[in-house]
Amino acid sequence: MNTFNLFKSDQEDGNKKYVPYVIETSAGLNRNFLMFLCEAYEEQNVAKEGEPEDYRTVLHLDPRLAPITVAVLPLMKKDGLAEKAKEIQHMLKEDFVTDYDTSGTVGKRYRRQDEVGTPFCVTVDYDTIQEKKEDGTPNDLFNTVTVRYRDSMEQERVALDDLVTFIQKAIKNYKPVVRA
């Protein structure tokens, strides 16, 4: 039985022998990015005892990686709140990626921002723009806004002059959510 020997054939022809090889490296980000998103995704039951279930979808992204860092939300679209909110957004967009949202109730806007992973929501309300209370006394909350944290849903009142520094410190001191 005759068998063909490639090595012997190459020697007889005087050709060099080559061993074919292929190195194909792949460093795709699709799986890694999907894993990153799945790890950050959470559905929380935020219903109070005795109430029907109410789930909140949250994307717990690190603030340095979130597509939107700060959302500016006027409490209402009227009475000068929207204009003041736009002014604040303009101030913040020099340092952060911002979003401005006026559609729906403020609670629904918070939920939408939680879903896309926005770590901070700045709410502009009547205390932000009114220098005096209805009784004529000075308003201590004038030129302040409410900052809401995505992960804990806690809210904190912050002076407009300190807002950029406050958010920068909050980003620097961010602690990831630990889930069981």
What do these predicted ranges mean?
Residues 1-180:
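NTP/phosphate- and nucleic-acid-binding module
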